[in-house]
Design a protein with these regions (language model features):
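Solvent-exposed soluble domains appended to multi-pass membrane proteins
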Residues: 1-220
Length: 220
């Protein structure tokens, strides 16, 4: 924001959930767009579809001149996954009877979100304005299902707290970020380093600790 960016937060859920309406302004966001601003949105079961929030993000990017930081939080593929199957459902196998329906719903939601994300990225790719996309998950799905006990990946407790991310720029051969294992708390500094907006405090943290990639904390 101090570098002249318009700052917008978007979340397709209730405005006061986790007091986002209070906390986002305190974090420096000029505007917060919540589910109340979506008119007759397309839904995936009881959640507003990711397609809708991607469209809202593009609307903000196209509407506001100058540089923009848009922090978009989706909710389509959040638990619970016990609802009835959708028309675009994906078949799954190898799970217990208890988990099959939930995994089917979860996989179907990912499939639909993946198509929406592709369309969003294609729109960004065609923009004249240089645009950086940072995509990450804030946590794994709920852990009440049996498959977490049987899948080898989750036998390592640390893997229950890891999520994927990517950083992508719509102007090829301009920025070439190095993707590495890192901590979510360091991802913001990573992005600022890529676009050349690190300040003295950021540089101190980077020089002192680098990009932490282990489960650890630092005392102040």
């Amino acid at each position: 924001k101090n570098n002249g960016y318009n700052t917008t937060a978007i979340h397709n859920y209730e405005r006061d959930f986790w007091e986002r309406d209070v906390k986002y302004p305190l974090l420096g966001f000029d505007e917060f767009i919540s589910m109340e601003s979506f008119k007759n949105p397309k839904k995936y079961d009881h959640w507003i579809a990711d397609e809708e929030i991607f469209n809202k993000t593009m609307e903000v990017l196209d509407k506001k001149s100058g540089n923009n930081l848009v922090f978009t939080v989706t909710v389509q593929n959040h638990a619970p996954f016990s609802y009835k199957s959708q028309k675009d459902s994906v078949n799954v196998k190898g799970f217990s009877k208890q988990d099959t329906q939930s995994m089917k719903n979860y996989a179907s939601g990912l499939y639909i979100s993946d198509k929406a994300l592709y369309n969003f990225m294609e729109t960004i790719r065609k923009r004249e304005k240089p645009t950086l996309v940072v995509f990450y998950g804030d946590h794994q799905p709920s852990y009440e299902h049996e498959y977490y006990k049987t899948m080898n990946y989750f036998k390592d407790e640390n893997n229950r707290y890891k999520t994927d991310y990517f950083i992508w720029f719509n102007k090829p051969n301009t920025l070439n970020p190095t993707i590495e294992n890192t901590s979510l708390i360091a991802l913001g500094n990573k992005v600022k380093e890529i676009i050349g907006l690190t300040d003295d405090f950021d540089r101190f943290i980077l020089e002192e600790y680098g990009f932490p990639n282990q489960n650890k904390y630092f005392d102040i």
